[in-house]
Amino acid sequence: MPSLLLASSSPYRRELLARLRLPFACESPDIDESHRPGETPHDLVQRLAREKAEALASEYPGHLIIGSDQVAVLDGQILGKPHTFERAREQLTAASDTRVTFLTGLALLNSSTGECQVDCVPFTVHMRELDQASIERYLRAETPYDCAGSFKAEGLGVSLFRSTQGADATSLIGLPLIRLVDMLIKEGVSVP
């Protein structure tokens, strides 16, 4: 079996991949994550997932390289990582009592053959109606400034959701394991 490499510095993705009980290494790719003019959110996450994997291919020959990228989309607009309390509060206020779709791009690159499988896995959450006090309590408790849309679903962020809809709940955290297993099997990896 080729060695697995997770092209990410995300501890959330690392924890998810560890669930598969396959040995893997992690390396953070250095790419430009800018949104291109006219690029749809769906196309953006697929491109970035692929570019993250490709950025490490020359350093890791003989590897299966996993790239992933996620955005939250509200009314057609991308909600990126907020980075600040103020921006996170704005995002959550806008998302109150709406549906937010998380798009997770996934790429599996075989650095030996150059073959790259790419997909986008959607997951939708219906947000509770949130008042400013509950938003601020959540932000102070969870500090989700490195999470798309200010949602840290693997923690207290789940309390913001009224309901969820999607084929793979792990995509909400940033690495759709069901789809990844399909890709790994196609590459001849035995899971479990």
UniProtKB/Swiss-Prot annotation:
GO terms for biological process: nucleotide metabolic process. Its cofactor is a divalent metal cation. GO terms for cellular component: cytoplasm. It comes from Pseudomonas syringae pv. tomato (strain ATCC BAA-871 / DC3000). The gene is maf-1. Keywords: Cytoplasm, Hydrolase, Nucleotide metabolism. Its main location: cytoplasm. InterPro entries: ITPase-like_fam (IPR029001), Maf-like (IPR003697). This is 7-methyl-GTP pyrophosphatase.
